[in-house]
């Protein structure tokens, strides 16, 4: 005969945990409500078959993990994101060698060997992010690691360009896993006030990876050939996959409670036990609802749409400017740069936009400086300063933008919000650089970069609008997830 399991009946919500709420759920001296006739009535009792957290201090809840354990998870996810973006441009210096080997004569096809990988960043999250919110983050990390390594091997041993391109885009889809669900992992581990530094570390990968990738890739392809680029990426991904498998744990609240309910059903024999957050839906219904969630956020939430467009344009600018460096800096042997970002705690999501408000407008300034000084052959240090300003401004648009989306939608929908962001951002990174040749051949570096500067200038009011009206917009344009 089964016994009633001992479990939490308190009905604690995750927002109570985040706020540090404490309730004495065992006190029977609480005042009962009165009926309309003035008699005492009993409050509804918690369902004994619903499995919940064991109070706000439950050690199984990711918010209550040790600081070291939280930082370990953020570090692994951030390194995985950096490695994924490193692969985006690390192969670029070897693309010409691949073209010679496979007899590629089309410049567009050569460019696709790089851009299709970044396009995978937009396609993968449409499925991976929703699945992570249904089945957990950890299984998606493991799946993406395995698929990425398999198709990176395929890239390294490709025998024709068609095979290479297919393997490349699938590898990009798999590499998007950490980028699309990493924000959800951070939201699972930290309350909003503690989330800034972790999100800054996580968000720097998409900016730093494309910068250092060509430096490493140029050295590798020149000395040992383009295929070794993928072998090195395979070694790196193998190390990260091993560390992920050995050290990471599940952080999705719903999945943790579901596993707890499953364990208790086996221990007690009570098949009626269910996790508190379980929905009365079939697996197919939950999957369909989760898959359309990023698209709904993108269509119905102006916050997600405009922040994604703004960060996407600046993300694409980084790739586009790379195409002009060989001609502008052909006499310069070494380029050095540094970036760093810091985000402070914020009591409301819109306060994350302070740095974007004030530093976002310097990006078009950098484009104007870079374009016209390069056009007029000013000393090379001046265009370098212009590109540094572009990079610095982009840093403080992309990172605060991602933190804002995670804070605005919380642990429940952070992965879907990031997926929507990647859906817009990644095509800019994949295809904006393809416009470089017609843009600069017709307009020159001066007016070509000025056009880009005016486009980014048009988006500078976005953080100012959301800083003032963001909370009202979030309330008015609530998306049924």
Swiss-Prot record:
Residues 1-63 are annotated as: Disordered. Disulfide bonds: none annotated. The keyword Transmembrane helix applies. GO terms for cellular component: plasma membrane. The chain crosses the membrane at residues 72-92, 111-131, 147-167, 169-189, 200-220, 228-248, 302-322, 353-373, 380-400, 403-423, 446-466. PROSITE patterns: MFS. Its main location: membrane. Glycans are attached at residues 64, 103, 252. Residues 1-13 have a biased composition (Polar residues). It is a multi-pass membrane protein. Keywords: Cell membrane, Glycoprotein, Membrane, Transmembrane, Transmembrane helix, Transport. Belongs to the major facilitator superfamily. Efflux pump required for efficient secretion of trichosetin or other secondary metabolies produced by the trichosetin gene cluster. Plays a crucial role in detoxification of the toxic trichosetin in Gibberella fujikuroi cells. This is Trichosetin biosynthesis cluster MFS transporter. The gene is MFS-T.
């Amino acid at each position: 005969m089964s016994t009633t399991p001992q479990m939490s009946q308190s009905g604690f919500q995750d927002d109570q945990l985040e706020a540090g709420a404490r309730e004495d759920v065992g006190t029977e001296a609480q005042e009962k409500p009165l009926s309309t006739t003035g008699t005492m009535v009993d409050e509804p009792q918690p369902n004994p078959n619903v499995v919940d957290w064991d109070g706000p201090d439950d050690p199984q809840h990711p918010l209550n993990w040790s600081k070291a354990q939280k930082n370990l998870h953020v570090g692994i996810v951030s390194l995985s994101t950096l490695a994924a973006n490193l692969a985006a441009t690390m192969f670029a210096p070897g693309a010409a060698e691949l073209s010679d080997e496979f007899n590629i004569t089309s410049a567009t096809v050569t460019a696709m060997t790089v851009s299709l990988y970044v396009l995978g960043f937009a396609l993968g999250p449409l499925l991976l992010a929703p699945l992570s919110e249904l089945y957990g983050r950890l299984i998606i990390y493991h799946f993406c690691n395995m698929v990425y390594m398999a198709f990176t091997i395929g890239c390294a041993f490709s025998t024709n360009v068609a095979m290479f391109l297919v393997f490349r885009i699938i590898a990009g889809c798999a590499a998007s896993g950490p980028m699309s669900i990493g924000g959800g992992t951070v939201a699972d581990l930290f309350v909003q006030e503690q989330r800034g530094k972790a999100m800054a570390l996580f968000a720097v990968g998409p900016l730093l990876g494309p910068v250092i990738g060509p430096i490493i890739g140029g050295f590798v392809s020149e000395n040992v050939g383009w295929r070794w680029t993928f072998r090195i990426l395979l070694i790196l991904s193998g190390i990260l996959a091993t560390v992920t498998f050995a050290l990471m744990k599940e952080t999705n609240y719903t999945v943790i409670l579901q596993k707890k309910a499953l364990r208790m059903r086996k221990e007690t024999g009570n098949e009626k036990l269910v996790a508190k957050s379980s929905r009365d839906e079939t697996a197919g219904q939950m999957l369909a609802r989760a898959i359309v969630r990023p698209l709904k956020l993108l269509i119905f939430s102006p916050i997600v749409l405009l922040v994604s467009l703004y960060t996407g344009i600046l993300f694409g600018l980084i790739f586009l400017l790379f195409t002009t460096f060989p001609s502008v800096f052909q006499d310069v042997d070494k380029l050095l740069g540094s970036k760093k970002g810091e985000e402070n705690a914020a009591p409301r999501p819109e306060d994350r936009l302070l740095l974007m408000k004030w530093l976002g407008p310097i990006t078009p300034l950098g484009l104007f400086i870079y374009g016209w000084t390069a056009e007029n052959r000013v000393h090379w240090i001046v265009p370098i300063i212009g590109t540094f300003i572009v990079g610095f401004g982009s840093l403080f648009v992309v990172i605060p933008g991602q933190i804002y989306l995670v804070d605005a939608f919380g642990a429940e929908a952070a992965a879907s919000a990031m997926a929507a962001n990647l859906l817009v951002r990644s095509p800019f990174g994949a295809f904006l650089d393809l416009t470089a040749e017609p843009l600069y051949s017709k307009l020159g570096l001066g007016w070509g970069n000025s056009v880009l500067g005016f486009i980014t200038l048009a988006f500078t009011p976005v953080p100012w609008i959301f800083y003032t009206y963001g909370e009202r917009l979030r309330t008015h344009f609530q998306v049924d997830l």
